[in-house]
Protein backbone atom coordinates (compact mmCIF):
# COMPACT_ATOMS: atom_id res chain seq x y z
CA UNK A 1 0.00 0.00 0.00
CA UNK A 2 2.82 2.39 0.92
CA UNK A 3 4.65 1.64 -2.33
CA UNK A 4 1.50 2.33 -4.32
CA UNK A 5 1.04 5.63 -2.48
CA UNK A 6 4.52 6.86 -3.37
CA UNK A 7 4.19 5.64 -6.95
CA UNK A 8 0.98 7.60 -7.36
CA UNK A 9 2.46 10.62 -5.59
CA UNK A 10 5.60 10.83 -7.70
CA UNK A 11 3.68 10.22 -10.91
CA UNK A 12 1.91 13.54 -10.33
CA UNK A 13 5.10 15.57 -9.96
CA UNK A 14 6.17 17.79 -12.88
CA UNK A 15 9.10 16.44 -14.87
CA UNK A 16 12.07 18.58 -15.88
CA UNK A 17 13.08 16.57 -18.93
CA UNK A 18 16.36 18.42 -19.33
CA UNK A 19 17.54 16.89 -16.04
CA UNK A 20 16.47 13.29 -16.62
CA UNK A 21 19.91 12.18 -17.79
CA UNK A 22 21.11 13.02 -14.26
CA UNK A 23 18.36 10.83 -12.81
CA UNK A 24 19.53 8.06 -15.11
CA UNK A 25 23.09 8.29 -13.77
CA UNK A 26 21.86 8.15 -10.18
CA UNK A 27 19.66 5.14 -10.92
CA UNK A 28 22.62 3.34 -12.48
CA UNK A 29 24.71 4.15 -9.40
CA UNK A 30 22.07 2.65 -7.12
CA UNK A 31 21.24 -0.25 -9.40
CA UNK A 32 23.60 -1.22 -12.27
CA UNK A 33 20.65 -2.72 -14.15
CA UNK A 34 18.85 0.60 -13.91
CA UNK A 35 15.75 1.75 -15.71
CA UNK A 36 15.75 2.87 -19.31
CA UNK A 37 14.53 6.46 -19.52
CA UNK A 38 16.12 7.43 -22.83
CA UNK A 39 12.72 7.88 -24.41
CA UNK A 40 12.32 11.02 -22.30
CA UNK A 41 15.33 12.50 -24.07
CA UNK A 42 13.79 11.54 -27.40
CA UNK A 43 10.67 13.44 -26.39
CA UNK A 44 12.74 16.40 -25.24
CA UNK A 45 14.41 16.89 -28.61
CA UNK A 46 11.39 15.79 -30.63
CA UNK A 47 9.30 18.46 -28.93
CA UNK A 48 10.95 21.11 -31.10
CA UNK A 49 8.31 22.36 -33.54
CA UNK A 50 8.84 21.44 -37.18
CA UNK A 51 9.88 24.61 -38.94
CA UNK A 52 7.76 25.68 -41.87
CA UNK A 53 9.27 29.10 -42.53
CA UNK A 54 11.54 29.79 -45.48
CA UNK A 55 14.49 31.44 -43.72
CA UNK A 56 17.81 30.90 -45.46
CA UNK A 57 19.70 30.50 -42.16
CA UNK A 58 18.42 28.26 -39.36
CA UNK A 59 19.56 27.14 -35.90
CA UNK A 60 19.71 23.44 -35.05
CA UNK A 61 20.26 22.17 -31.49
CA UNK A 62 22.54 19.11 -31.40
CA UNK A 63 23.94 19.06 -27.85
CA UNK A 64 23.11 20.33 -24.37
CA UNK A 65 24.82 20.51 -21.01
CA UNK A 66 28.46 20.85 -20.01
CA UNK A 67 30.93 18.92 -17.85
CA UNK A 68 33.61 21.62 -17.57
CA UNK A 69 32.40 23.36 -14.37
CA UNK A 70 34.05 26.72 -14.96
CA UNK A 71 33.78 28.67 -11.72
CA UNK A 72 31.77 31.51 -13.28
CA UNK A 73 29.25 29.34 -15.15
CA UNK A 74 25.90 27.89 -14.07
CA UNK A 75 25.37 25.69 -17.14
CA UNK A 76 26.41 22.37 -15.52
CA UNK A 77 23.97 23.04 -12.69
CA UNK A 78 21.06 24.26 -14.81
CA UNK A 79 21.51 22.18 -17.97
CA UNK A 80 23.20 19.16 -16.45
CA UNK A 81 25.89 16.92 -17.91
CA UNK A 82 26.80 16.88 -21.58
CA UNK A 83 24.53 14.78 -23.74
CA UNK A 84 24.14 14.68 -27.47
CA UNK A 85 21.18 14.27 -29.75
CA UNK A 86 21.14 11.14 -31.95
CA UNK A 87 22.55 11.62 -35.44
CA UNK A 88 19.41 10.25 -37.09
CA UNK A 89 17.22 12.81 -35.33
CA UNK A 90 19.54 15.70 -36.24
CA UNK A 91 19.73 14.61 -39.86
CA UNK A 92 15.95 14.31 -40.13
CA UNK A 93 15.43 17.84 -38.79
CA UNK A 94 18.24 19.22 -40.95
CA UNK A 95 16.70 17.65 -44.04
CA UNK A 96 13.34 19.20 -43.17
CA UNK A 97 14.93 22.63 -42.70
CA UNK A 98 16.80 22.38 -45.99
CA UNK A 99 13.69 21.21 -47.83
CA UNK A 100 11.94 24.30 -46.46
CA UNK A 101 14.55 26.65 -47.89
CA UNK A 102 17.42 26.72 -45.38
CA UNK A 103 20.82 27.00 -47.04
CA UNK A 104 22.83 27.52 -43.85
CA UNK A 105 22.61 25.60 -40.57
CA UNK A 106 24.20 26.67 -37.29
CA UNK A 107 24.64 23.72 -34.92
CA UNK A 108 24.00 24.73 -31.32
CA UNK A 109 25.19 23.40 -27.98
CA UNK A 110 26.41 24.69 -24.64
CA UNK A 111 29.64 22.91 -25.57
CA UNK A 112 28.96 21.86 -29.13
CA UNK A 113 32.55 20.78 -29.81
CA UNK A 114 32.01 18.01 -27.22
CA UNK A 115 29.24 16.52 -29.36
CA UNK A 116 29.43 12.73 -29.41
CA UNK A 117 26.45 10.61 -30.33
CA UNK A 118 27.60 7.83 -27.99
CA UNK A 119 26.96 10.11 -24.99
CA UNK A 120 23.24 9.92 -25.68
CA UNK A 121 23.19 6.14 -25.37
CA UNK A 122 25.88 6.01 -22.67
CA UNK A 123 27.91 3.65 -24.88
CA UNK A 124 31.53 2.72 -24.31
CA UNK A 125 32.51 2.64 -27.98
CA UNK A 126 33.22 5.80 -29.94
CA UNK A 127 30.23 7.51 -31.48
CA UNK A 128 29.90 10.20 -34.12
CA UNK A 129 31.88 13.33 -33.25
CA UNK A 130 31.07 16.90 -34.27
CA UNK A 131 33.42 16.48 -37.24
CA UNK A 132 31.57 13.34 -38.27
CA UNK A 133 28.22 15.06 -37.84
CA UNK A 134 29.31 17.95 -40.07
CA UNK A 135 30.43 15.46 -42.71
CA UNK A 136 27.07 13.67 -42.58
CA UNK A 137 25.08 16.90 -42.81
CA UNK A 138 27.18 18.13 -45.72
CA UNK A 139 25.71 15.28 -47.78
CA UNK A 140 22.47 17.30 -47.97
CA UNK A 141 22.80 18.61 -51.50
CA UNK A 142 20.87 21.86 -51.04
CA UNK A 143 22.74 22.76 -47.84
CA UNK A 144 25.42 25.35 -48.64
CA UNK A 145 26.95 26.28 -45.28
CA UNK A 146 27.46 24.75 -41.83
CA UNK A 147 28.47 26.63 -38.70
CA UNK A 148 28.51 25.72 -35.00
CA UNK A 149 28.74 27.35 -31.57
CA UNK A 150 29.71 27.53 -28.72
CA UNK A 151 33.02 25.65 -28.36
CA UNK A 152 35.56 24.97 -25.64
CA UNK A 153 39.30 24.99 -26.51
CA UNK A 154 39.85 21.60 -24.88
CA UNK A 155 37.36 19.94 -27.23
CA UNK A 156 38.68 21.21 -30.54
CA UNK A 157 40.10 17.97 -31.94
CA UNK A 158 42.49 17.35 -34.81
CA UNK A 159 39.62 15.56 -36.53
CA UNK A 160 37.48 18.70 -36.35
CA UNK A 161 40.31 20.91 -37.62
CA UNK A 162 40.87 18.51 -40.52
CA UNK A 163 37.17 18.61 -41.31
CA UNK A 164 37.41 22.39 -41.58
CA UNK A 165 40.24 21.89 -44.04
CA UNK A 166 38.46 19.34 -46.24
CA UNK A 167 34.76 20.22 -46.01
CA UNK A 168 33.89 23.21 -48.19
CA UNK A 169 30.47 23.53 -46.56
CA UNK A 170 31.98 23.94 -43.08
CA UNK A 171 32.61 27.65 -42.77
CA UNK A 172 36.07 29.01 -41.81
CA UNK A 173 34.62 30.53 -38.65
CA UNK A 174 35.32 29.45 -35.09
CA UNK A 175 33.50 30.72 -32.01
CA UNK A 176 36.14 29.94 -29.39
CA UNK A 177 35.98 32.05 -26.19
CA UNK A 178 39.38 33.10 -24.86
CA UNK A 179 38.00 34.31 -21.48
CA UNK A 180 41.37 35.65 -20.26
CA UNK A 181 45.00 36.11 -21.30
CA UNK A 182 46.20 35.52 -17.74
CA UNK A 183 47.14 32.00 -16.66
CA UNK A 184 46.34 32.78 -13.03
CA UNK A 185 42.86 33.99 -13.97
CA UNK A 186 42.29 31.01 -16.25
CA UNK A 187 43.22 28.72 -13.36
CA UNK A 188 40.80 30.48 -11.03
CA UNK A 189 38.14 30.18 -13.71
CA UNK A 190 38.86 26.42 -13.89
CA UNK A 191 39.27 26.59 -17.66
CA UNK A 192 41.86 23.77 -17.55
CA UNK A 193 44.04 25.32 -20.23
CA UNK A 194 46.72 28.01 -20.31
CA UNK A 195 47.25 31.06 -22.48
CA UNK A 196 49.90 29.13 -24.41
CA UNK A 197 47.54 26.21 -24.96
CA UNK A 198 45.05 28.57 -26.56
CA UNK A 199 47.68 30.28 -28.74
CA UNK A 200 49.07 26.92 -29.89
CA UNK A 201 45.56 25.74 -30.79
CA UNK A 202 44.88 28.85 -32.86
CA UNK A 203 48.25 28.45 -34.60
CA UNK A 204 47.45 24.83 -35.42
CA UNK A 205 44.07 25.82 -36.86
CA UNK A 206 45.56 28.62 -38.96
CA UNK A 207 48.27 26.32 -40.30
CA UNK A 208 45.77 23.69 -41.42
CA UNK A 209 43.08 26.11 -42.55
CA UNK A 210 44.93 29.19 -43.87
Feature-to-residue mapping (PLM):
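Conserved SAM/AdoMet-binding glycine-rich loop
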Residues: 99-210
Amino acid sequence: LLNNFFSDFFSQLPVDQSRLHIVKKRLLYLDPVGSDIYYFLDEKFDSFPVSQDKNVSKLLTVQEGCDKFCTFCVVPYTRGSEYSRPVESIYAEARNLVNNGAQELTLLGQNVSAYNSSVYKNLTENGVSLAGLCKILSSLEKLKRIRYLTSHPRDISDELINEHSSNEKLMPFLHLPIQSGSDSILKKMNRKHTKEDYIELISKIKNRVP
